[in-house]
């Protein structure tokens, strides 16, 4: 009863304005003094707390006074449930959770001045955990929206080798044709014949039939006029050109065949070396699989 009848001293800064006492009370609330017993008990509790903290290791406590995360319940509706974007750093700062417990215990800097390099791994770990579904029976939206395909596992920028033109491949062949043979295989006044580049068509490589000479027709001397001799000279020149062209083609084919024989032997030797190297690689691979299992 004595406590009820005691008058409380008013705040000296409190001046009730003329426009309303209720509004002034809301804006400037009264500050009640503490009772001596309450103040003494609070001082006692504070000293006890300090002794406990000095004797026991420090335990990180949250300064957030609101409800904790695990006390919150999310309303779930199968049709309207959606995951929204959340800033992870803001979420951690709101709930008073340090980025990593090791930094909270050993770092001399305050949480707001911690270097970004030390918090990066823990933030990545927490972000990977945050993408997990909230309920075990509900798959995450990333799995529902973008299923993983087998083709996506391969890198996008694969270095695929460009196709090689077989004509551009130069096989090292120790072949030096005779200059006299090259002269016989080349047309006078034109480029020298090159057996490495010259190719013949299938029609040119077909065997040619033997040409039989026509039967000689006896013509008396009194009929051998100027017209006869002009026709005779013309036929002889055509026959000579035909023989020269045929001989030139035969010489070119012979030199080309000689070069191809040399190239073929060089390629055979190269294939033999490659097969030998392939056999060694297969033996090494077989030993590795026998020791460490199949690849």
Swiss-Prot record:
Region (Leucine-zipper): 248-255
Protein's GO biological process: rhythmic process; skeletal muscle cell differentiation
Keywords noted in UniProt: Biological rhythms, DNA-binding, Nucleus, Transcription, Transcription regulation
Positions of region (Disordered): 36-76, 92-149
PROSITE patterns membership: BZIP (PS50217)
Induction comment: Accumulates according to a robust circadian rhythm. Displays only a moderate amplitude in the liver (1.6-fold) and none in the brain.
One term under GO cellular component: RNA polymerase II transcription regulator complex
Pfam name, any one: bZIP_2
Boundaries of every bZIP domain copy: 225-288
Subcellular localization, as worded in the UniProt entry: Nucleus
Main location: nucleus
Region (Basic motif): 227-247
Biased composition (Basic and acidic residues): 36-52
Signal sequence, renumbered to the chain: none
Molecular-function annotations in GO: DNA-binding transcription activator activity, RNA polymerase II-specific; sequence-specific double-stranded DNA binding
The family this protein is said to belong to: Belongs to the bZIP family. PAR subfamily.
Cited PANTHER family: HEPATIC LEUKEMIA FACTOR, THYROTROPH EMBRYONIC FACTOR RELATED
Other known facts: Mice deficient for all three PAR bZIP proteins (DBP, HLF and TEF) display a dramatically shortened life span and are highly susceptible to generalized spontaneous and audiogenic epilepsies (due for example to the noise of a vacuum cleaner) that are frequently lethal. The down-regulation of pyridoxal kinase (Pdxk) expression in these mice may participate in this seizure phenotype.
Oligomeric form and interacting partners: Binds DNA specifically as homodimer or heterodimer with other PAR factors.
Protein name, per record: Hepatic leukemia factor
Organism: Mus musculus (Mouse)
């Amino acid at each position: 009863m004595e406590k009820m009848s005691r008058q409380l001293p008013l705040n000296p800064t409190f001046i009730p304005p003329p426009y309303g006492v209720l509004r002034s009370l809301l804006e400037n609330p009264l500050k009640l003094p503490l009772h001596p017993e309450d103040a003494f008990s609070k001082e006692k509790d504070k000293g006890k707390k300090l002794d406990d903290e000095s004797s026991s290791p420090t335990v990180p406590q949250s300064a957030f006074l609101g409800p904790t995360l695990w006390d919150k319940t999310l309303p779930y509706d199968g049709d309207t449930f959606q995951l929204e974007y959340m800033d992870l750093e803001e979420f951690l700062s709101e709930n008073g959770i340090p980025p990593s417990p090791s930094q909270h215990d050993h770092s001399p800097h305050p949480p707001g001045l911690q270097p970004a390099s030390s918090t990066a791994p823990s933030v990545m770990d927490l972000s990977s955990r945050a993408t997990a579904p909230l309920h075990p029976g509900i798959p995450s939206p990333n799995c529902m929206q973008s299923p993983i395909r087998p083709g996506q596992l391969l890198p996008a920028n694969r270095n695929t080798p460009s196709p090689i033109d077989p004509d551009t491949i130069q096989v090292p062949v120790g072949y030096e044709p005779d200059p006299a043979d090259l002269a016989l295989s080349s047309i006078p006044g034109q480029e020298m014949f090159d057996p490495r580049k010259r190719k013949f068509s299938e029609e040119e490589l077909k065997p040619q039939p033997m040409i039989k000479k026509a039967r000689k027709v006896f013509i008396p001397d009194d009929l051998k006029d100027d017209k006869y001799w002009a026709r005779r000279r013309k036929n002889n020149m055509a026959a000579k050109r035909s023989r020269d062209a045929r001989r030139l083609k035969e010489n070119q084919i012979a030199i080309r065949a000689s070069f191809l024989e040399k190239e073929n032997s060089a390629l055979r030797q190269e294939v033999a070396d490659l097969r030998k190297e392939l056999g060694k690689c297969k033996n090494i691979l077989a030993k590795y699989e026998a020791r460490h299992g199949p690849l």
